[in-house]
A protein has these predicted regions:
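Hydrophobic scaffolds flanking metal-cofactor catalytic centers in soluble metalloenzymes
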Residues: 1-140
């Protein structure tokens, strides 16, 4: 896989994204995060969402697709794009789609429904843990 390094340790396979490891990453979204692009870009407000999310298999893809279908337009800035073209980058459903330079689920700072991940915001709205709603790569 281009851009990734995989290390097998018995039954466990560790997968590292080289660009992410070279980035200016700081892990508090919306609080001065420099983002994960090759150059610091806090003004974009993308945090770690610039590349979308690589999904951990078919089960996670099905879960994300099902949860996306429950998101209301007032809480999901790119609801129209998702309705028209789906939330996945392609037919393999292995990653989320990019819209305007970031993950389709990223509500931008100006969005009236709340900035940040639409899945994260929706989980909090119903009293559930965001980790149960988001792709695993987004919180591990």
């Amino acid at each position: 896989m281009d851009g990734f390094e995989e290390i097998a340790a018995g039954e466990t396979v560790w997968r590292f994204e080289r660009e992410f490891l070279r980035s200016h990453w700081t892990c508090i979204w919306g609080r001065g995060c420099l983002g994960i692009l090759p150059e610091a870009a806090p003004h974009l407000g993308h945090g770690c969402c610039s590349h979308g999310a690589d999904l951990d298999g078919d089960d996670e893809a099905r879960m994300i697709g099902a949860l996306a279908a429950t998101l209301p337009p007032e809480g999901f800035e790119h609801h129209a794009e998702a309705s028209a073209g789906g939330v996945f980058s392609d037919a393999t459903h292995s990653s989320t789609r990019i819209v305007d330079g970031a993950c389709i689920f990223l509500n931008r700072p100006h969005f009236s429904g709340g900035a940040g991940c639409a899945l994260h915001v929706a989980a909090l709205d119903v009293g559930e843990a965001p980790q149960e709603w988001k792709p695993s790569v987004c919180w591990q």
